[in-house]
Amino acid sequence: MKNSIEIEIPEMGKIKFESLRDTNKKSKNIPIKNSKYIKTISYNELEKYLNNEYILSLLKKRNKIRVFESKAINMISRYRYDVFVKYYYVQSYITKTNYKLAKEIYLEHIKSFNNFSEPDGRKEKPEDFINNFNKLIKNIQKDGIDKTIIPITKNGEIIDGAHRLAIALYFNLKVPFVMFDLLDANYNKQFFINRGFNEKYAKIIDKEIVEKNNYNIDLEGIKKWRKKIIQKYLWYCVP
């Protein structure tokens, strides 16, 4: 496989894919830390779990696919800044705090990402994204995330499922995932800013979610954030 390649994606333009390594990921074997094998499924079953024909078309067909799971905190990455934006929305939606601002930031980052249009055609305007996300939050809050699977690259970067990962992160859930030999896309903070995401919104996300103004996620930062999330989760569960 080539070290890097540019692919034209509808509504997004040319996106560079390369081999990336985040400090939150392992360098050998299963890239997601503290992962556990849970089952093997067929390619047809994967289609049901993904429910996204466009993403499925990118994945190499295999007869048997091994499914693993790990805590959502182990799957975050500096290369997926959008997960933190989505987390801020989930937090505001659930707690009913700063929701108007969170909605503005969420829609701004979606606009800079794909201009409110996804390759599978299921979401084509801002209201579609808001309604779909709200429904997803309610469903996962009620039923968990076991009915879906998130595909990742061999380096541990998610290929699809940023909304689901953000919700799982908020509720401290374990996330089922499968690995595919694909290159990684660098959707870091600068990616969004370069495409029009307002820097004042980025500063809010850095302060409220990432807790590092320069957004340099390191192992110590991950540990501190994990502790805070677990504390919040325990508080949320107390009747």
Task: Describe the predicted segments one by one.
Residues 149-152, 166, 176-178:
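Ordered hydrophobic segments in well-structured contexts
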Residues 1-41:
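Intrinsically disordered, low-structural-confidence terminal and linker regions
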Residues 2, 9, 30, 40-44, ...:
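Short linear elements at protein peripheries
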Residues 177-238:
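Active-site or metal-binding loop neighborhoods of secreted/extracellular toxin and effector enzymes
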